Swiss-Prot record:
Source organism phylogeny: Eukaryota, Metazoa, Chordata, Craniata, Vertebrata
Any single biological process term in GO: neuron projection development
UniProt organism field: Homo sapiens
Gene Ontology CC entries for this record: plasma membrane
Name this protein carries in UniProt: G protein-regulated inducer of neurite outgrowth 2
Domain of life: Eukaryota
Function of the protein: May be involved in neurite outgrowth.
Listed Basic and acidic residues bias regions: 31-41
Chain intervals for the UniProt region annotation (Disordered): 1-94, 118-172
Tissue expression summary: Expressed specifically in the cerebellum.
Entries under InterPro entries matching the protein: GPRIN2-like/GPRIN3, GRIN_C
Pfam family, one: GRIN_C
Length: 458
């Protein structure tokens, strides 16, 4: 006689005994043949119900009849109690994500007309427990349902048992418990029925995270496992990846794989800056099955491959974009800012020009305080006329001190120019002044009219 015990979840209800809940609550529980009517899902609950016909008529093991297992005992006060029954039932809720089923009806559902499985897009976790002759092995099936149709019907058949040295089919194994417990993970997707025959792996060993399942004794039966056709997705836990283990994925035929949706940064794990690097290779023992090994890498252990560029998933920026440019400096066009050339500044017309800085910064700088070294002069340009007597100041306030300095510099410059002039220019200027006077005096002494009249023939 087998019974089911729901695994206590982090949000398990703290009720001393099992009580029926209304449809507005977080979960609905259907049990027995009397409660077989088809129930429709609410916003946060799902009911799975299986028939108990064949389970009650099957013979039971004598060891189990004599000594009921520990799962028959009432559960703790922290979780809901499980009632012993000849068959099994499925119970799923979004709060606990716990599904239980009897050992005799392991992974077997009726036709869609008998029990309709209606669920939301939330993850549905189903766990089964079965006691053996000499040891206990626990197999849990974790299914993540993602699809366009809210109603998915699947019919799973129990796999066959192996003989001496037999081992449970390890198509999807992960999270081995210390008590030699094997768990299988699968993704179920689709609106049609899925029927998967049992897999016989033979001597194929399954890679697991903690330990491998050792062969049982000759008289021990291996646990019955269920295999569904999952999408081509890798179902590994972070605990298995940290241990450096490998998990196996079964290829899907005609099933569209949807990525898992994440709602927050903490759920996606981007703030931890951890990633999973997956290497897949085809195995020789299983044709059509790929062995995928996942390795965990962090910020310290990241070794980029040659020719590859790693970018942050959240900001989509690489480390080279944020690092200072060493090989190729950034230009103004890369940043999208057109930097105008800095013109040479002059305090006054006679002062030496200030050289522009050698390198222009790409982005504009904002300075709140004025530095004492780069104080601009209030006088930008001083223009003098030709005589040097009038002046105009542009772009500066009229200040007596500034004007006095400008006039003094202008007079000093003119004095230096007069001293540099050679003395020959002075002599030439004196001779140039005397030349016209001498020409006038000579013309007066010798009148041309008289000379011309006397010299002219009659």
């Amino acid at each position: 006689m087998s019974s089911s015990r729901p695994e206590p979840g982090p949000w398990a209800p703290l009720s001393p005994r099992l009580q029926p809940l209304s449809q507005s609550s977080s979960s609905l529980l259907g049990e027995g043949r009397e409660q077989r009517p088809e129930l429709r899902k609410t916003a946060s609950s799902t009911v799975w119900q299986a028939q108990l016909g064949e389970a009650s008529t099957r013979p039971q093991a004598p060891e189990e009849e004599g000594n009921p297992p520990e799962s028959m005992k009432p559960a703790r006060a922290s979780g809901p109690k499980a009632r012993p029954s000849a068959g099994g039932h499925w119970w799923s809720s979004t709060v606990g994500n716990v599904s239980t089923m009897g050992g005799s009806d392991l992974c077997r559902l009726r036709a869609p007309s008998a029990a309709a499985m209606q669920r939301s897009h939330s993850d549905l976790v189903r766990s089964t427990q079965m006691r053996g002759h000499s040891g206990a092995r626990k197999a849990s099936l974790s299914c993540s349902a993602l699809g366009s149709s809210p109603v998915h019907r699947a019919q799973l058949q129990p796999g066959g048992t192996s003989g001496q040295g037999g081992q449970a089919p390890a198509g999807l194994e992960r999270d081995l418990a210390p008590e030699d417990e094997t768990s299988n993970s699968a993704w179920m997707l689709g609106a049609s029925q899925l029927s998967v025959p049992p897999l016989d792996l033979g001597d194929t060993t399954a890679h697991s995270s903690s330990a491998q399942a050792e062969p049982k004794a000759a008289e021990q039966l291996a646990t019955t496992t269920c295999h569904a056709l999952p999408p081509a997705a890798l179902l590994c836990g972070m605990r298995e990846v940290r241990a450096g283990g490998c998990c196996h994925a079964l290829p899907a035929t005609g099933i569209l794989a949807f990525p898992k949706l994440v709602a927050s940064v903490s759920e996606s794990g981007l703030q931890a800056q951890h990633g999973v690097k997956i290497h897949c290779r085809l195995s020789g023992g299983l044709p059509g099955h790929s062995h995928c090994c996942a390795h965990l890498w962090g910020p310290a252990g990241l070794v980029p491959e040659p020719g590859s560029r790693t970018k942050d998933v959240w900001t989509m920026t690489s480390a080279n974009d944020l690092a200072p440019a060493e090989a190729s400096p950034l230009s103004a066009q890369d940043a999208g800012v057109q930097a105008a050339p800095v013109a040479a500044c002059k305090a006054v017309a006679t002062s030496p020009s200030l050289e522009a800085p050698a390198a222009l910064h790409v982005f504009p700088e904002v300075t709140l305080g004025s530095s004492l070294e780069e104080v601009p002069s209030p006088v930008r340009d001083v223009r003098w006329d030709a005589e040097g007597m009038t002046w105009e100041v542009y772009g500066a306030a009229v200040d007596l001190e500034v004007l006095g300095v400008a006039i003094q510099k202008h007079l000093e410059m003119q004095f230096e120019q007069l001293q540099r002039a050679p003395a020959s220019e002075d002599s030439l200027s004196v001779e140039g002044r005397r030349g016209p006077l001498r020409a006038v005096m000579q013309s007066l002494r010798r009148p041309s009219c008289c000379g011309c009249s006397g010299a002219a023939p009659e």
